[in-house]
A protein has these predicted regions:
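Beta-strand-turn-beta hairpins that frame and shape the catalytic cleft
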Residues: 4, 148, 182-186
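A short secondary-structure junction motif
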Residues: 58-64, 95-105, 193
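Pocket-forming structural segment of enzyme catalytic cores
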Residues: 71-74, 99-173
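C-terminal and late-domain segments of enzyme folds
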Residues: 158-205
């Protein structure tokens, strides 16, 4: 079995350290032959087997952060779309997979999974949606089979998927929204698996 090279992209946004610690912990517990590194170098991504894109804050800041690294978006497209290697987006990192986001204007995303990032309707609920909430798994036949339990969320915007088959799990907060999206080699969670104790580590695994 080939050694895994997992790269967590550092582009000035996202909880890089806790993501790295979670991956390192899984590698240790499960005794997986893998290295995990944090990098903003497209060359490093090219030589990786798995790529993780964390993200928090505003969509626009995150996508700009990626665009400002020369060659980064091209290499990501190459890695994910051309080579079809495993990719995992967390929180805003997952939202960046969409075609566009309506957060503070209209901003273009990576466009890997069809859909738009829209504001959660607040009505009577506190925003952001913050804290623990449960997920309902809609497709149990995949390599990733998360526990239907509580995960840690912090967000005010959600991924409105065009195709229902891209929704692996949903969560309710005023409305049902996708808490895990997927397409072929691409997975994304709206919640923070690195802050979701053991069940979060399960997903990372």
């Amino acid at each position: 079995i080939m050694k895994k090279n997992i790269t967590i992209i550092d582009y000035g946004s996202g909880n890089i350290l806790s993501a790295k610690q979670s991956f390192a912990r899984i590698i240790e517990i499960e005794n997986i032959d893998a290295d995990v590194c944090v990098s903003n170098n497209p060359e490093t991504i090219k030589n990786s087997t798995h790529v993780v894109l964390p993200g928090q804050g505003a969509f626009e800041t995150c996508i700009s952060g990626l665009e400002e690294i020369p060659g980064m978006i091209d290499e990501l497209n190459n890695f994910v779309i051309t080579k079809k290697k495993p990719f995992f987006g967390i929180c805003v990192g997952m939202q960046l997979l969409a075609n566009n986001s309506l957060e503070n204007g209209n901003h273009k995303g990576l466009g890997w999974i069809d859909g738009t990032i829209e504001k959660l309707p607040s009505k009577k609920l506190k925003m952001p949606h913050m804290g623990w909430n449960s997920i309902e798994v809609l497709n149990k036949n995949l390599k990733i089979n998360p526990k239907e339990t509580d995960y840690y969320f912090v967000h005010s915007y959600y991924f409105n998927c065009e195709n229902k088959e891209n929704i692996l799990a949903k969560t309710n907060y005023g409305i049902d929204f996708p808490s895990i999206v997927y397409k072929e080699n691409i997975y994304g969670t709206q919640f923070h698996p690195e802050k979701s104790s053991d069940q979060g580590l399960d997903i990372i695994k």
